[in-house]
């Protein structure tokens, strides 16, 4: 009986509407990361950028590396962010990993984006900003850097987009190992734009 009561308490405030948003927004994010960032040479920061770095150097699918790194970040911050956050984040993470695995089966739709890094940076930022932003807005996170950014933002009382910028810059620094220097400027543009979009969406209510 105690176990049943605990499960009811865990899910009593969970909204079906938010679960649906978590699934579709994480799929939107996965589509953009695969179709734009993984083929354009314009990377993301945070855990998303780390998944691309691991894919490049060790051929580890972001569907796997993303799930592992996200789980570590979530377990580190669940006490601060609460039970509802964990439920929505689990749905978002599974949605992202499953969607990315599905999209990996197909050829890129826009391979020409490699020759248009500015457009890739802008389009990629829209996919990442909206996908991650909608998840953050409902109180969840599709990736570990979102969970980490939400935790740090709450602790230091700073707007989330500036926390994103700091963590993204760290990953971009590591990405110098496989991304040409001239493309890092476009990567910086995409992380700044996506972070601002997340910040705007976070302030809105569903």
Give the residues covered by each predicted segment.
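Core subunits and conserved enzymes of cellular information-processing
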Residues: 2-206
